[in-house]
Design a protein with these regions (language model features):
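Generic recognition of short, well-ordered alpha-helical segments
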Residues: 20, 41-44, 139, 143, ...
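N-terminal Rossmann-like NAD(P)+-binding domain of SDR-like oxidoreductases, especially those catalyzing
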Residues: 1-134, 174, 203, 259-267, ...
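Residues that scaffold the ATP/ADP-binding catalytic core of kinase and kinase-like folds
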Residues: 83-84, 137-138, 244
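A glycine/serine/threonine-rich, flexible loop-to-helix segment
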Residues: 87-90, 141-149, 210
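C-terminal substrate-binding subdomain of Rossmann-fold SDR/epimerase-dehydratase oxidoreductases
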Residues: 6, 10, 152-275
Length: 275
């Protein structure tokens, strides 16, 4: 596939570069993954997140309009909906109101609204997916599963926020990509599809599983002060994409996590320079 890839290094907010690239490469479909996504950094430097996530998305929307693309797909997050209590079975559907609680969440919510506005105002052919927390190989080591795994492999502490029982829904990156591909090919224009696995785990449960798979002691678990605006729980209702597009996640949680930990064990040369 390498001979079919052209890599262009640039700023997602550079409209001239975006327009030139889409035109020169005769791009017919845009999938917008570009985002600042780490909540812990968003509370330190919110401007960086709003610039990339909102203005960057608008830049790509304008460039896509100018290029006359056939489809613009925007990749978003469950976090735009806010958070859920820990003691409830409630889940977020595509009809749930947007209630972002952090700068990152708000920046992604703003991007979602921009995408819908370009559909309603300009007729740009768009779709949106909102996904739960991803995991899998090649994930940047700032994220919790690769952070815990790489720290454990180096016998370093696994830093857990004081709210260790906060829950996340976990989706393997390949299941996510298969869902995006399906929405691109068969999704209805102007629609949003939630992509979730239904698998929930607390941060402490993640730490315990990583320590189990790496054979490291529980003494590596370390409590650190909580971050501002730390959401309690996210879970998505993926009924719409399952019923309309016949999508199902195909990778089990236990197997997927074990394979992910093994990947980091076997690919130290990839992640060590990034830490």
């Amino acid at each position: 596939i390498e001979d079919r890839i052209v890599f262009v290094h640039g700023d997602v907010c550079d409209r001239e570069l975006a327009e030139t690239t889409l035109r020169d490469q005769a791009v017919d479909v845009v999938v917008n993954f570009a985002a600042e996504s780490h909540n812990s950094l968003a509370v330190v430097d919110p401007t960086r997140f709003f610039r990339t996530n909102v203005l960057g998305t608008q830049t790509m929307l304008d460039a896509s309009r100018a290029a006359g693309v056939e489809r613009f797909h925007h990749v978003s997050t469950c976090e735009v909906y806010g958070d859920l209590p820990l003691d409830t079975e409630e889940v977020f559907s595509e009809e749930s109101p947007y209630r972002p609680r952090t700068p990152y969440n708000a920046s992604k919510a703003g991007a979602d609204h921009a995408v819908r506005a370009y559909f309603e105002t300009f007729g740009l052919p768009v779709t949106i997916t909102n996904c739960s927390n991803n995991y899998g190989p090649f994930q940047f080591p700032e994220k919790v599963i690769p952070l815990f795994t790489t720290n454990a492999l180096d016998d370093l502490p696994l830093p857990m926020y004081a709210s260790t029982q906060n829950k996340r829904e976990w989706l393997h990156v390949l299941d996510h990509c298969e869902a995006i591909d399906l929405v691109l090919r068969e999704g209805r224009l102007g629609e949003t599809y939630n992509v979730g696995s239904g698998v929930e785990a607390t941060i402490e449960e993640i730490a315990d599983l990583v320590l189990l798979h790496t054979g490291k002691p529980e003494s590596l678990k370390t409590i650190v002060p909580d971050r501002p605006g730390h959401d309690r729980r996210y879970v998505l209702d993926a009924t719409k994409i399952r019923d309309e597009l016949d999508w199902e996640p195909s990778r089990g949680w236990d197997e997927g996590l074990a394979e992910t930990v093994a990947w980091y064990e076997e690919n130290r040369a990839w992640w060590e320079p990034l830490k």
